[in-house]
Amino acid sequence: MAAKDVKFGSEARAKMLRGVNILADAVKVTLGPKGRNVVLDKSFGAPSITKDGVSVAREIELEDKFENMGAQMVKEVASKANDVAGDGTTTATLLAQSIVNEGLKAVAAGMNPMDLKRGIDQAVIKAVKELKKLSVPCSDSKAITQVGTISANADETVGSLISEAMDKVGNDGVITVEEGTGLEDELDVVKGMQFDRGYLSPYFINKPETGNIELENPYILMVDKKISNIRDILSLLESVAKSGKPLLIIAEDLEGEALATLVVNSMRGIVKIAAVKAPGFGDRRKAMLQDISILTFLYNSDVISEELAMDLDKTTLEDLGQAKGVVITKDHTIIVGSGKKEIFKQILIRQQLIESTSDYDKEKLNERLAKLSGGVAVLKVGAATEVEMKEKKARVEDALHATRAAVEEGVVAGGGVALVRVAEKISRLKGQNEDQNVGIRVAVRSMEAPLRQIVANSGEEPSVVTNNVKDGVGNYGYNAATDQYGDMIKFGILDPTKVTRSALQYAASVAGLMITTECMVTDSPKEDKSSDMPSPSAGGMGGMGGMGGMM
């Protein structure tokens, strides 16, 4: 077992605090409308430029192991805030730094660290309740646009696109962010269900100008096994041909004689037909096929399955689903349709979401729910260079997370004003003893830190602006972008309640633990023994010289 390096008391806390401050100082320069960028060196490729707090925090590793422990604990605050709310990482880091700095001063003055932590926790619990009272619902497009704009660093185009996307696919709809090919940001909305499976044969293409397959009001056959024998579906094909409607086959695979026969029939115009592989694998494939069946009016039966003792060769038109339309490219299939059973299915999936503990399962359930709810929207980010593209994409993703959080729990006045108002309301809170009262005051003072940093980053005097804001009431605050005082809601400066709440809770949680630290243990640095070894060049040269003499 490797030897350990152990530090105690004020020496340990001083090292830890230095690490906290190095990381937080790097992150907090990005806060507010006049916050600056941070350039991150990469081991390969061009450096990346970001204004995202968690991206900066993740890059920081310090050489001193004790300092690094402090930095990593604050990094955990940013990561947790990012995972839960998707934004507010800089605010969370700044709050943690402020609580740790104020708290360690109190510890150095002789306060009981455990009572300090209890006081901080008590203040945060009360502050969260007050935040919820200040919160107002965020349901209209204007508020969603404002939240997106603020989170995207005052980019109104991004805010408008996010609002439009949520309007088209619903609050539960899937909205993804991708790198575009042009200079302008674009929104592409896909109604219905899309999955990553393209056509099995290019000979099915009926729109050569686009290279796609388009079917109007098609029948849909869903099978959870391979189809290789054409006899299994021959009678069904005859019935479909008589109906005059197209047919889409979704199966585990379609091969050999069956695929060849379908291609020939399609090319001769006997029946309009297309085939794709079923999406997903295992249990997820079954779930997705069931979702498609709901989307396509499939009432009389479920997916054709051997588990249900259903024979493919006995399938009739009544066993098929129907859709309004289908578009198939070489990579994707889009099915547009809606069934009356959708609402019931959505309720079932929502229940599974509540019960699920796996992040992966929750992500996939959310995708399924979105496809039944309205569709998929793709935000394509435009930029002139790859470096700008990466920076902008990160901002758009932050803005998207912020708007989702706003819809979920509402919004409060932005620019650090909500925390200042909450601090005023809990300033008279009392603990069980004086040390707890000091902890409460530490938390209250720290809640001013985001406003102070926004002002500092805009080049103004933090104390003057903070006092002016504290003299006001309600949503009265400071607009750092225009250097004006007024109603933050009317200025369109909003913060999602969930983001502010998460930042405060996670900052206090980790900072409280750091304040109560008395000992730090890490591996001792390994000594470099290479300097003690004899230089190989001396002996080698001597040998060479000797050999030269012999020759």
From Swiss-Prot:
Catalytic activity of the protein: ATP + H2O + a folded polypeptide = ADP + phosphate + an unfolded polypeptide
A Pfam family cross-referenced in the UniProt record is Cpn60_TCP1
Q: Which PROSITE patterns match?
A: CHAPERONINS_CPN60
**Which chain regions cross the lipid bilayer?**
none
Chain intervals with Gly residues compositional bias: 539-551
Reply yes or no: does the keyword Ion transport apply: no
Q: What is its EC number?
A: 5.6.1.7
Q: How does this protein assemble?
A: Forms a cylinder of 14 subunits composed of two heptameric rings stacked back-to-back. Interacts with the co-chaperonin GroES.
Q: What is this protein called in UniProt?
A: Chaperonin GroEL
**Organism for this UniProt entry:** Buchnera aphidicola subsp. Chaetophorus leucomelas
Source taxonomy: Bacteria, Pseudomonadati, Pseudomonadota, Gammaproteobacteria, Enterobacterales
